[in-house]
């Protein structure tokens, strides 16, 4: 049987784009057990409260929920265990330098399979304040109104 190619999205963290200013993104491999892979292939995971830490020169994904595999036995995994991420050494050093700056953190944006291997899209992000969120919401609303007005004008409707 041929291996699947391309990118199959498993989970995305929509709340991260709302709560953080995304400065840079990285793709990292993830170390998983067998039942975790089977659970991911079933399309079950949650990145909502997830974050990454750099500890002893290694990047660890924390608080990401991959539920137990339904058909698993005593070999099942713990759903919220820390998982090691695979990055190049220079990427880890760059991230270490950037996360030492105040206010920057590592947040998972999406979890997917690429060419049969599980990957995580990590974002180097800065937290938004409440007024930033309100401003972004107002900008989106204004853009939607402009697009709606232009759509009416193009279709020939009068306001």
From Swiss-Prot:
Pfam families: SmpB. Required for rescue of stalled ribosomes mediated by trans-translation. Binds to transfer-messenger RNA (tmRNA), required for stable association of tmRNA with ribosomes. tmRNA and SmpB together mimic tRNA shape, replacing the anticodon stem-loop with SmpB. tmRNA is encoded by the ssrA gene; the 2 termini fold to resemble tRNA(Ala) and it encodes a 'tag peptide', a short internal open reading frame. During trans-translation Ala-aminoacylated tmRNA acts like a tRNA, entering the A-site of stalled ribosomes, displacing the stalled mRNA. PROSITE patterns: SSRP. This is SsrA-binding protein. Keywords: Cytoplasm, RNA-binding. GO terms for cellular component: cytosol. It is found in: Cytoplasm. Its main location: cytoplasm. Belongs to the SmpB family. HAMAP family: SmpB. It comes from the Bacteria. The keyword Glycoprotein does not apply. GO terms for biological process: trans-translation.
């Amino acid at each position: 049987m041929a291996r699947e190619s391309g990118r199959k999205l498993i989970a995305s963290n929509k709340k991260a784009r709302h709560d953080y200013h995304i400065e840079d993104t990285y793709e990292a491999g993830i170390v998983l057990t067998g039942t975790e892979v089977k659970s991911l292939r079933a399309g079950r995971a949650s990145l909502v409260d997830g974050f990454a830490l750099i500890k002893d020169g290694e990047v660890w994904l924390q608080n990401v929920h991959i539920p137990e595999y339904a058909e698993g036995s005593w070999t099942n995994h713990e759903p919220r265990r820390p998982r090691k991420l695979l990055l190049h050494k220079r990427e880890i050093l760059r991230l270490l330098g950037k996360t030492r700056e105040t206010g920057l953190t590592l947040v998972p944006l999406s979890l997917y399979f690429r060419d049969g291997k599980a990957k995580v899209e990590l974002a180097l992000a800065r937290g938004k304040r409440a007024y930033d969120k309100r401003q972004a919401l107002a900008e989106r609303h204004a853009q939607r109104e402009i697009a709606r007005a232009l759509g009416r004008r193009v279709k020939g409707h009068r306001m």
